[in-house]
Amino acid sequence: MSRKLFTGVALAVGPLVWASAALLATSSAYANPFELRLSESGYSTQTVVGITPGVSYSGSFGTFTVSIDGGISTTLPQIDLGSTDLSTSTPGLLTIELSETGLLSPTGLTQWLTQLSISDSDPGSSVSLESAVDLTNTIFGTGTPLSTLSSASSFIGLSGTAGADISTTPYALTLVMTVTSAGGGTFSLDGSLQPVPEPASLTLLGTALVGLGWLGRRRRKQV
């Protein structure tokens, strides 16, 4: 590769590398307060307080045996009930909430992706997942509802996308998972909320490739 072409590569790809580095530097700064809360009618609420990136709970709660390994990814503002395993031998309704406060980005009009996967052996049961942004930065706040996903299917994956105008910071994210047992069985669940990635990096990459093509044509003309 000639020196001119090498310089062109550096100039074309440089903005993409810089943008990626800036994103990683900003994303790695997330270390915010978050809480996991379990509730069922007739039982005292259980709350676990932590700091990103993880929170967990394991043991008996209400009419359920619970194992939750959740939290937030530190690479972007994402909250995740990533491994939620439940079992019960009686009917019951369990609510699981996860919330993070102190988020500073992204801002402006943002699309948010909510995802839910369900695998259970409890015929007649149902699971729902609600997501929300709260611009008052309140833990478990649901000021701006995003998506609601629900199903009575034993094996299914669901997703929903909704927009929210992040007009002020800091703000909070909240997930509310509701599990209704019809009489006994096991549940393996996963719920998450994260911003939909913007195509900015793809635009930069496209610009870089166009620049390389232009340099290549110019070099061929000079030969």
Protein language model regions, located:
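Short, threonine-centered small-residue motifs that mark membrane-proximal processing/anchoring sites
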Residues: 2-33, 182-210
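Residue-level marker of intrinsically disordered, low-complexity segments enriched
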Residues: 3, 7, 11, 15, ...
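Intrinsic disorder/low-complexity segments enriched in polar/small residues
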Residues: 5, 131, 199, 222-223
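Helix-boundary and membrane-interface capping/anchor signal
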Residues: 30-195
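C-terminal membrane-anchoring or membrane-association module
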Residues: 214-223
